[in-house]
Amino acid sequence: MLVGFLLVVFNYAALAYITATHFELLVAPIMKDINTLIRNNRRWSRLLKEEDPGFFERLSLAQKPRFLWIGCSDSRVPAERLTGLEPGELFVHRNVANLVVHTDLNCLSVVQYAVEVLEVEHIIICGHYGCGGVQAALENPELGLIDNWLLHIRDLWYKHSALLGELPPEKRVDKLCEINVIEQVYNLGHSTIMQSAWKRGQNVNIHGWVYGIQDGYLRDLEVTATNREILEQRYRHGIANLLNDPDLNP
């Protein structure tokens, strides 16, 4: 009986050792990656303090950004980095395919806070070429929950499919990326938040940009809206410009 008991204890200890070793082998690479982020943060903080000893003290007092950025969640489109801005200079909201949907309380709460509390002067809606969300909306695969979100882009595809369908797939995606930005500028301009802000004379402008991951350049789609009347004009002008593109009318 004693021998049997010792065998059980030995087997349990061996199993525990193997399990712990296996766990360590699995977790160690993950923790190494995570710890790299912490080390990077320490290095960044140290260098910034060396360049500007009072930076974090000033930053901790308040934020007063002049810009709100509504962009795509894509990791290749880092808003502050590609605009050359520092912490505290850009208020940021990101979602898949940079959509402004009137039922999205998350986005609208960000916009309201930015406009009414921070009093930003500029709201930039920025898409990017080769957007995976736009491409998925075109190809219409079954992705799960996100399919409901992509319906907003799919509606734009149906709206302009007669012309966009003439383009090769890559250009079709990029053109729809541009159309999507213009439509989101229009959506935001028609929100009660922006309508109220313009009505009370607040100086806040909406811009539509597209970022090129291939070259790192931001492109202004020239649909900047400063009030409701300008919004309607710029929307019509912007869509007409895109649909009159030589690629669409060879």
Model-derived regions, located:
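Intrinsic-disorder/low-complexity regions
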Residues: 10-11, 18, 39-40
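Gly/Ser/Thr-rich loops at beta-strand to alpha-helix junctions
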Residues: 74-76, 128-133
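Active-site cofactor/substrate anionic-group-binding motifs, chiefly glycine-
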Residues: 76, 80-110
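Hydrophobic alpha-helical signal peptides and transmembrane signal-/tail-anchor segments
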Residues: 1-11
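N-terminal short beta-loop-beta anion/metal-coordinating cradle
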Residues: 48-89
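Short, Lys/Arg-enriched N-terminal segments with co-localized hydrophobic residues
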Residues: 15-30
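Short beta-strand segments
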Residues: 70-72, 94, 124-128, 207-212
